Amino acid sequence: MNAPQAPVLVADIGGTNARFALANPTLTSAPLLNDSLREFAVIEFPSLSEAAQHYLHHIGIHTTKGVFAIAGHVDGDEARITNHPWVITRTRTATMLGFDTLHLINDFVAQAMAISVLGPQDVIQIGSAKWEQVPLSAATRNYGIIGPGTGLGVGGLVIRNGRCYPLETEGGHVSFPPSTPEEIRILEILSQQFGRVSNERLISGPGLVNIHRALSEIDGIDPGPLRPQDITMRAADGDIRATRTINLFCNIFGAITGDLVLIQGAWDGVFLTGGLVPKLLNSIQHSGFRQKFEHKGRFSAIMARIPSLAVIHPHPGLLGAAAYARDTEPVPQDIKA
């Protein structure tokens, strides 16, 4: 039997925080090693390599392999973090850390890969359609993933013969398709500001503000400057316009999530992730999300059978980075079939 495989350093790097953990890529569930998770403010370090070195020194373990999920554009050897000045070069970072292998992936690629290791305890079902935990041995599985946060991430995961292939897209920038007179009026108002209006202009944190502003204009009200959290707090306090905003957000979210299933052929389910989903989970569950998701004309009966699931695992980016490491590693001889 071969010696135990060395852990892989996985990271989820955002504009504010850098999260690190160690992972065993041979595990198909719970790949993150116990008590290895640490979180640091990116402002504390001049570079990603120094943050990673600090983590490895702090935890007292050396490794030579890493997968870093980056909240920003990854272009070959280089990655730029959105909302932070770090510019990450893969080869230089690997050299600084003494790594033999380092992968830089987009954070939403990591979110998609996380689907393959999520368990029933990591998701909440939205609607009545049932979901079974992803069987990696399945010959064919197609999943969608969509996540509103600062922007709107859209992607997918294709499983073929136990191998996972993430789909990296810019689906959040698809044009917004209104389906009611109210939504048409909102589109007209937002078009005056943005010209072309994408789904991200509505289904995101800033999108909440845009919807509220448009509804206020329809009502002839000046709401003043608001943040997304102001709207959710007002809705919790019973404010009528804020509540309308949340309900409309959830309805549109459901409609475009259903569109994602049709476009990608994600017949095995779609996962909701991103920073807004946990905060709006109760609203999503009790809104028209699922009705709009299923309301697809001649495909409505098929859509009713497709599960939609909110991801509640606190660190899906790290899970996904670990899953990515698994699918970039050769299968050890002692566990081959």
Curated annotation (Swiss-Prot):
GO biological process, one term: glycolytic process
Protein name: Glucokinase
Keyword ATP-binding tagged: yes
Enzyme class per UniProt: transferase
Organism expressing this protein natively: Xylella fastidiosa (strain 9a5c)
Domain of life: Bacteria
Record-linked PANTHER family: GLUCOKINASE
Enzymatic reactions: D-glucose + ATP = D-glucose 6-phosphate + ADP + H(+)
Family to which the UniProt record says this protein belongs: Belongs to the bacterial glucokinase family.
EC number per UniProt: 2.7.1.2
GO molecular function, one term: D-glucose binding
Location (main, coarse): cytoplasm
Protein residues bound to ATP: 11-16
A Pfam family per the record: Glucokinase
Keywords, sorted A to Z: ATP-binding, Cytoplasm, Glycolysis, Kinase, Nucleotide-binding, Transferase
